[in-house]
Amino acid sequence: MMNKLGLIIVSVILALIQTGCAEQSTWMSLNSSNPRIIWEVKPQADLENITGEQISTPEFKMSDYVKGVVPGTVFTAYVEAGIVPDPNYADNIYKVDETFYNRPFWYRTEFELPSSYSEGKRVWLHFDNTNRFADFYFNGEKISGTKTSTKDVSGHMLRSKFDVTNLIKKSGKNVIAVLITDADQKKTRKAKDPYGVACSPSYLAGAGWDWMPYVPGRLAGITGNAYLVVTGDVVMEDPWVRSELPTLQKAELSVSTDIRNASSSPKEVVVSGVIQPGNISFSKDIRVEGGTTARLSINKDDIAQLVVDHPRLWWPNGYGDPNLYTCKLTCSVDGKVSDVKEMTFGIKKYEYKMVDNVVGYPVLTFFINGQKIYLKGGNWGMSEYLLRCQGKEYETKIRLHKEMNYNMIRLWTGCVTDDEFYDYCDKYGIMVWNDFWLYVAYNDVAQPEAFKANALDKVRRLRNHPSIAIWCGANETHPAPDLDNYLREMIAKEDNNDRMYKSCSNQDGLSGSGWWGNQPPRHHFETSGSNLAFNTPAYPYGIDYGLSLIHI
C-alpha cells in the first residue's frame, strides 16, 4: 500500500504537470487542489490605498487572510475556514451579515514555474470563470483592461486568458492578484429587486429564489478552474468538430479552429489531427500573420476520410449507447509542436418537427438520428447552492438521472458553468435544455454587451457536447428584442443551427410552468397544454411541469 508521503508526491506531480512525449504542452493547475498553491483572500477595504500592482509582488505579505477555495466563492472560503457557522444547519445562513461579503475582495497566490519549462516558450494564464467582475494583476503589473479601468472581466461565463510570457519569472516566485467585485444589484436580502436579475450574466439564484436562500456575496469569487499553459508562439482556440448525418450509415465531419499567432512575425502552421475510434488522420497548412488570428477549416472536400461509414452514433438514455469520439489536434511550426488540443464529441442529428398528438393538435416533437424521442426529465436549479459541487460528484448526480430513466435535464437559467456537468451528460446520454441567464425582468439587464460576450463564449465553449439539445433564451419570458435577435443570429453562426434556439422556457406553445400549474395526467394526453385556449402548438412534455401527488 502506498504511504501518505508517496500519495502526496504523486498528487504534487499530477497537479503541477501533465506532459507526454515532446508534443505535449506543459499544464499547471492553480486550483486549491494543487498542494503547492495557497490562495489568500481578504476584503479590499482592509487593504486601503494598496494597489493590485503592489499586492502582486513577492515582497507584499498579506496578513490575517482567509485561505481561499478555487474554484469557489468568497463566502465559501469563510465557511470552509470555520468563521461562518455551517450555513446548511437551521437558519444560520439568514443570520450572516451579508454586507461583509457584498463588497470587493482580493485573491492572491504565488507559484514557481515547473522545471519542464524551457526558454523561448509562450506562457498563458487562464481563468475559466470569475463572478461577477474581475481585475487581474501579475508580477506587479495590471494585465486586464487598462491601467485605469475597473471591473475588466464582466460575467460568470467569460473565460480569461493572458499572455504573461514577458512577465513570467523563470525562477523564483510569481504572484497573481485578482480583485473580485460582487454584483451591483440587490446588495441586501431585503432589497426591492426580488431576484437581482439585472446582475446577469451571473448565477441568478445567488440573490435568492423561491426555492433557495440569499447567499451573502451572491457567489462572487474565482468560480472556475485556474491554470497555466506553456506553448509555442502559435496556439489553437475553440476547436470544433461538427457532424452532419445524411443517413444513419454515413456521417460527414468537419473540423475548425482559430489559430492565434502571438509572435510578431508570420508563421507557416501545419495543423494535424487524429479522430478515434477509426484512426481518421488529417492535416492542413495555413499561414498566420504576426499578432493575428486566422480560422482554419477542414472538411470532406479536403480529406475524404472525414466521411465516416457506419458511424457510432450518440443516443440519449433509453434509445441506444451514447457513443463518443475524440479528436486530438496538433499545430506545428517548422516541424516543432506549438500546441495540442484534445476534445470529445458525438455524431448525432437533432431535428424538431410539428407532429399531431392523439387529439390532432400539432406539438413540437424532438427527434434524434431520425428517432422520435419521448422526453423525460426535470429542472436542475443549482448543482450546490455554494458552488461546492465539482469533479466526480457530477458523475454521481448525472448517473442517478440515468438510473431514474431520465433522458433530459433542463438547466435552469444556465446555472452551471462547470465543464464536468456536460462531460457526464455526454457520457450517460442525458440531453440538456440549456438556458441563458435571463428571468422575467429582461429590460433590467444592466450590461447587455457583457451578456452578449458571455453568451458567445458559452456557445463556443460547449458546442462540442452532443448532450446539448436546445438553447433557450430566458426563463419564463422572452429576452429583450436586442438580446433575442443577438442570440438567434449568434447561435445560427457559431452552432450552425444544429440545435434549436427557443426564446422562452414556458410560452409560445410550451405546456407548463412547473408546480405553479400542476395538472392531472390526462392533461398531457388530451390537450395541447396550457395554451389550449389560444389553439397554439405545445410540447407534448412540459419541461417545467410537475404532477401533484393527488393525481399520481
List PLM regions with ranges:
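Intrinsically disordered, low-complexity Pro/Gly/Ser/Thr-rich segments with frequent PxxP/GP/PP motifs
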Residues: 283-310
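Accessory beta-strand-rich segments of carbohydrate-active enzymes
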Residues: 37, 41-46, 77, 81, ...
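Solvent-exposed, conformationally flexible loop/turn segments
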Residues: 104, 171-172, 250, 289-296
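Bacterial N-terminal signal peptides
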Residues: 8-17
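Beta-strand-rich binding/interaction modules
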Residues: 136-138, 251-288
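Active-site-adjacent substrate/metal-binding segments within catalytic domains
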Residues: 76-113, 117-126, 131-138, 144-153, ...
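Bacterial Sec-dependent signal peptides at the C-terminal "C-region" and cleavage site
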Residues: 16-27
